[in-house]
């Protein structure tokens, strides 16, 4: 998959002139120690060194493997304050607001007031990552990236992760990759009372492959571009399926019609986003369709058949 290639360093070409990730991580460590000394962030529990057995694959030159906690300056559960549909002005993001693909969904919100004890500490900041620690088996461990400018908070089934010195978009992509899912999440899921749970204290120990900072940004741009292309193709395929279904219905209607009525000759051009009138579908069924349009339909039909086989 795209994300798997991204975290293995196979999506973008490496530039030997880029500052190595090792230097970047050393600088982040020094900056965090300064922030701790200034009492701007809390001191974290020591993290274990990474053993050879834990390393999932060979990294490209200039990359480093680190624990997520090495690049965090905040790692905390959300509010347990009861939220409702009517009272309050601050939206509360909950586990259902993170989609299976890691996108954030801002519908079906509940609210709390500004006077609860968890605020302002638990206001979300743009760039915060939300980790789903309790949900169904398929959704537990999914992460969303908060990129709103408005005031939101989050519920206790989510964990807020605030990244420091690394592209939060890159980390978000990494945490939704197949690598992260199969090696860092699934082995530690616990099924309990009909729900899947992930120990929140484990998150900081998970492993993140870190490229040089410039390459992180290249990877994010490449993945976002490919995702947009994928979504556009998916929409075109759905439109083609809809057209094929309409065409098949007209073919069957034509084949089993008791009384055939002559139709004037027509030339049909293919437009994926249009709703095809019945008369045009019947004309297409009789073969009155431009050759290049027919070739396009045949090619798309073969692609659809290949995807569904």
Where are these regions (language model features)?
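A short glycine-rich beta-alpha junction/loop motif
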Residues: 151-158, 169, 190-213
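Short, ligand-facing micro-motifs at secondary-structure edges
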Residues: 79, 99-110, 129-154, 169-173, ...
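Sequence-specific dsDNA recognition surfaces
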Residues: 50-54, 69-82, 96-128, 298-302, ...
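Short amphipathic alpha-helical coiled-coil/interface segments
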Residues: 21-32, 223-226, 244-252
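Extended, domain-scale alpha-helical bundle/helix-rich regions
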Residues: 1-54, 263-265
């Amino acid at each position: 998959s795209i994300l798997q290639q991204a975290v293995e360093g196979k999506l973008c070409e490496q530039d030997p002139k880029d500052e190595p990730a090792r230097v970047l991580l050393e600088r982040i460590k020094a900056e965090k120690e300064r922030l701790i000394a200034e009492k701007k962030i809390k001191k974290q529990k020591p993290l274990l060194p990474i053993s050879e057995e834990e390393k999932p694959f060979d990294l490209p030159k200039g990359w480093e493997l680190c624990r997520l906690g090495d690049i965090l300056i905040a790692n905390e559960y959300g509010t347990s304050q009861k939220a409702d549909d009517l009272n309050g002005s601050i939206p509360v993001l909950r586990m259902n607001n993170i989609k299976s693909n890691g996108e954030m969904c801002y519908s079906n919100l509940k609210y709390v007031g500004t006077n609860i004890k968890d605020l302002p500490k638990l206001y979300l900041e743009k760039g915060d990552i939300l980790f789903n620690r309790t949900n169904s088996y398929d959704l537990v461990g999914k992460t969303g990236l908060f990129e709103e400018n408005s005031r939101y908070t989050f519920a206790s089934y989510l964990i807020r992760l605030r990244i420091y010195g690394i592209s939060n978009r890159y980390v978000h992509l990494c945490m939704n990759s197949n690598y992260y899912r199969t090696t860092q999440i699934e082995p530690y899921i616990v099924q309990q009372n009909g729900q899947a749970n992930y120990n929140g204290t484990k998150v900081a120990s998970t492993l993140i492959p870190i490229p040089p900072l410039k390459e992180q940004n290249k990877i994010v741009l490449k993945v976002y571009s490919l995702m947009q292309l994928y979504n556009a193709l998916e929409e075109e395929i759905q439109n083609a399926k809809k057209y094929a279904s309409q065409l098949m219905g007209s073919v069957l209607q034509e084949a089993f019609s008791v009384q055939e009525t002559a139709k004037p000759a027509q030339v049909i051009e293919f437009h994926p986003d249009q709703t095809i009138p019945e008369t045009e579908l019947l004309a297409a069924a009789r073969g009155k369709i431009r050759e290049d349009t027919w070739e396009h339909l045949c090619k798309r039909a073969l692609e659809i058949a290949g995807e569904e086989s």
